[in-house]
Amino acid sequence: MQEQQYQLNSAVAEQREVSGVLRNTYGLLALTLAFSGLVAYVSQQMRLPYPNVFVVLIGFYGLFFLTVKLRNSAWGLVSTFALTGFMGYTLGPILNMYLGLPNGGSVITSAFAMTALVFFGLSAYVLTTRKDMSFLSGFITAGFFVLLGAVLVSLFFQISGLQLAISAGFVLFSSAMILYQTSAIIHGGERNYIMATISLYVSIYNLFISLLQIFGIAGGDD
């Protein structure tokens, strides 16, 4: 009887912890997306240039690893907003590039709507079914290296359709990451809401950029 009561108490405590992580993650994610969007708007309105690729890589990975190091302290929140603000800054020049196209406004609107639909749809699916998506870890690892190789190839060779294939690959990769990370929170694989937020934010960012490229290419063929 005592063992059953202990198991019940443990299950209740675990469920409370999961609910807390989910609540904190989605709350912080909403704030970082809003902050990132504000920075992107300012960057776009000021017509700031897109930074050098090395600046982007150093800025992103530097702030990312800083966030990992500070994830268990209040400073982790500061570095989280620094990272997402930096990514918002890089988004501004990209939006200006698409706004310069004849159908740029509709491309951005379509990419934004599809990103929201995919994120909310996948999140709702995992939260409702509570399926364990840990089996996606192998696909995610393999997908990362395949996409990395494809990106490197695209830097040196002009292959017809490769950019579209890379963008489609990133859509699948980002979708898998959303499923995996949401499932990890539910099933105990992730208990740090800062890391969960960063993972979901990066997935949403990559998903949006990839959909922008796909809709932009499709619109250019019209």
UniProtKB/Swiss-Prot annotation:
A Pfam entry, by short name: Bax1-I
The residue ranges crossing the membrane are 26-46, 48-68, 75-95, 107-127, 139-159, 166-186, 198-218
Molecular function terms from GO: calcium channel activity
Q: What is its main location?
A: membrane
Q: What InterPro entries is this protein classified in?
A: Bax_inhbtr1_CS, Bax_inhibitor_1-related
Keywords for this protein: Cell membrane, Membrane, Transmembrane, Transmembrane helix
Q: Where in the cell is it found?
A: Cell membrane
Example of a GO cellular component annotation carried by this entry? plasma membrane
Q: Does the keyword Phosphoprotein apply?
A: no
Kindly list the biological process annotations in GO that this record carries. Answer: negative regulation of apoptotic process; regulation of proteolysis
The answer on whether this UniProt entry bears the keyword Transmembrane reads yes
User: What CDD domains does UniProt report for this protein, alphabetically?
Assistant: YccA_like
Task: Tell me how this protein sits in the membrane.
Answer: Multi-pass membrane protein
Q: Which family does it belong to?
A: Belongs to the BI1 family.
Protein name per Swiss-Prot or TrEMBL? Uncharacterized protein PA2604
Q: Which organism is it from?
A: Pseudomonas aeruginosa (strain ATCC 15692 / DSM 22644 / CIP 104116 / JCM 14847 / LMG 12228 / 1C / PRS 101 / PAO1)
